[in-house]
Design a protein with these regions (language model features):
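Interfacial segments of alpha-helical transmembrane regions
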Residues: 17-29, 79-93
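Hydrophobic alpha-helical transmembrane segments
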Residues: 64-65, 125-149
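Canonical alpha-helical transmembrane segments
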Residues: 63-85
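C-terminal TM-helix exit segments that contain a strictly Trp-centered aromatic cap at the helix terminus
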Residues: 34-42, 91-114
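Cytosolic juxtamembrane helix and N-cap/initiation of the first transmembrane helix
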Residues: 2-31, 161
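Transmembrane alpha-helix entry/boundary detector in multi-pass membrane proteins
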Residues: 38, 43-66
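Interfacial non-cytosolic loop connecting adjacent transmembrane helices
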Residues: 46-52, 100-137
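Cytosolic juxtamembrane helix at the C-terminal end of the final transmembrane segment
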Residues: 150-171
């Protein structure tokens, strides 16, 4: 293992100050809230469409909550590694949501959401059922996620840089 890798591993285990942890936790919870609102909108869509969301889709959707849960655990323990999890959460969640909803999902595991929002707006036949309708609320609750997740990612990167610089100025290894 190179010295730079050892230094980075040591840095990632460094304890955060209360203020930095609070800022990151706020952003992490904002991303989590946006994801929850988006999922609630899917329930609203399913009700509108009279569509029964399959159980496997409920289980798959839990994957969205892995990064914010890990980040929350790291933040509660004030670990510098939370910088990476909050930043990754912002990038991964935004990219995944936009890919699935604006383009085509990579896999056909998404039930009625195997179609992008543009096709769903026009209407599609899915498993013998005609599904149509994407309204402004659907769009807002899709686009609000990257609107908060990208600034969260940028804040995590900025705070990491500041935190590391403060360690260097204090004479500690970063």
């Amino acid at each position: 293992m190179t010295q730079s890798v050892k230094d980075e591993a040591k840095f990632l285990d460094t304890r955060l100050d209360d203020e930095t942890a609070a800022v990151l936790e706020k952003w992490n919870l904002v991303i989590l809230g946006a994801a929850l609102l988006h999922d609630a909108d899917h329930i609203r869509q399913a009700i509108r469409w009279r569509y029964k969301i399959p159980m496997q889709l409920w289980i798959i959707k839990l994957a969205v909550y892995v990064l914010p849960t890990v980040a929350e655990f790291l933040l509660k323990n004030k670990r510098a590694s939370s910088f990476l999890t909050v930043a990754a959460n912002g990038i991964v969640t935004s990219a995944a949501f936009l890919k699935v909803h604006l383009f085509k999902p990579t896999t056909d595991i998404w039930g009625a959401w195997n179609y992008n929002y543009f096709k769903l707006a026009k209407g599609v036949w899915h498993e013998g059922q005609f599904i149509k309708g994407i309204d402004w609320i659907d769009w807002a609750l899709l686009l609000d996620l990257p609107a908060v997740a990208i600034p969260a990612c940028m804040t995590a990167i900025k705070k990491r840089r500041e935190f590391k610089q403060n360690l260097l100025e204090a004479g500690e290894e970063a």
